[in-house]
Structure formats: structure tokens, C-alpha cells
Amino acid sequence: MELKVIDAKGQVSGSLSVSDALFAREYNEALVHQLVNAYLANARSGNRAQKTRAEVKHSTKKPWRQKGTGRARSGMTSSPLWRKGGRAFPNKPDENFTQKVNRKMYRAGMATILSQLTRDERLFAIEALTAETPKTKVFAEQVKNLGLEQVLFVTKQLDENVYLASRNLPNVLVLEAQQVDPYSLLRYKKVIITKDAVAQLEEQWV
């Protein structure tokens, strides 16, 4: 499998031989869906909470007498039927949203994502990703010269200048190869991977 390599102007300047197992795998939509759902679920903090009818602030006084008013009977204002009443089945902070994905499935899922991105010409390789200064304006111009709007850069080791220059750009994300996740790969329109990061991804997932 050959992966297109682009230069500093975003033009295809060559190709890089890559593993078919990682970049030429058949697309598995169900597996990708499971991976993304698991990633988003595991990112949840799980701190949402509502109060039960015993926890809301209320009076224990009966709103009106049991019979004779013509209205529905009511015991207290903390009932879930009442405005500002407690929830019948409230969410609690100890709720666990963790979803487990086996290592074999995760590797297969990442491979199918990378393969589909390559087929859709959304994934390219680049010689290296560097920045002379930690200036956002300079790095933004560099990204613009590549002809990119919304892009994920993947490097083997994150350069400090690149990190500082890119962190305030809303449509640019820079990750190390070991940090790459399925959601980020699919979220951005283009994915640019440095050559040494490609080698590391092959070592991790093949």
C-alpha cells in the first residue's frame, strides 16, 4: 500500500510504502460505531445528579384536604408530579458509563478507520511537522499554505513550539501517535501524519 506524501505547499511530492494491514483494511462500520461510542462514553465524567422526592426542599404539610375539593388527592409538594418536586428515577454521580473494548477489536477498528481515510484521500503523510517559533499566527499561515482548514496532525513526538503555536487554533489538533483516538481521526476533515509517526502506528497496531 502506498500513502501519498505532501510537501509544505500541500502538493503531492511522493509516496510512502505502508502496511496493508493498517492502511488497506476493509471498512467495518459496526466496529467503528462501537469504538466511537465507547470512546465518548469513557470520556464522560459521570457527575450528573438529580434529587429524589426525599432530597428536595419541601414542606410535609398536605397541600389540601383529602376529600371534598374535587381535586386530585395530594400528600406533599415533593411528589414527582409537582413542579419543583423530586425526580422519580434520578441520575446519580456514581453512575458508571465505562464501555470496555478488547485490544484486538480496538486495533482492528483503528486500522479500518485509517484505511477508509486513505481511500477517501483524507489522510496524507508529511516529512516532518516543525515550527520555528511558538507563534500562532505563523503556524496558522503554515497550515493555510498546506491548503487545510480542519486538520489533525499526528507526530511521533510533539514539538514544544508546534504545541504552543497550535493550541489556540480551533480547527487544528496536534497529537502524538500514542494519543491518537478513533473520534479525533473521524472528526477532522484531513489527517496529516509524519513519516516517523506512521512507523510508530504500524508498530503499535499491526
From Swiss-Prot:
Tell me the Gene3D superfamilies matching this sequence: 3.40.1370.10
For this UniProt record, the keywords arranged alphabetically read as follows:
Ribonucleoprotein, Ribosomal protein, RNA-binding, rRNA-binding
Q: Record's NCBIfam families?
A: rplD_bact
Gene that this polypeptide is encoded by: rplD
Q: Does the keyword Protein biosynthesis apply?
A: no
Which residue windows does the record flag with biased composition (Basic residues)?
59-70
Give the protein's biological function.
Answer: One of the primary rRNA binding proteins, this protein initially binds near the 5'-end of the 23S rRNA. It is important during the early stages of 50S assembly. It makes multiple contacts with different domains of the 23S rRNA in the assembled 50S subunit and ribosome.
Q: Which HAMAP family match?
A: Ribosomal_uL4_B
Q: How does it assemble?
A: Part of the 50S ribosomal subunit.
Q: Record's Gene Ontology CC terms?
A: ribonucleoprotein complex; ribosome
The record's section on InterPro entries has: Ribosomal_uL4, Ribosomal_uL4-like, Ribosomal_uL4_dom_sf
GO terms, biological process: translation
Q: Which Pfam families match?
A: Ribosomal_L4
| Keyword 4Fe-4S assigned | no
Name it: Large ribosomal subunit protein uL4
Organism of this sequence = Neisseria meningitidis serogroup B (strain ATCC BAA-335 / MC58)
Q: Which family does it belong to?
A: Belongs to the universal ribosomal protein uL4 family.
Which molecular function GO terms apply here? rRNA binding; structural constituent of ribosome
Region called Disordered, residue ranges: 46-95
For this protein, the record's PANTHER family field holds:
50S RIBOSOMAL PROTEIN L4, LARGE RIBOSOMAL SUBUNIT PROTEIN UL4M
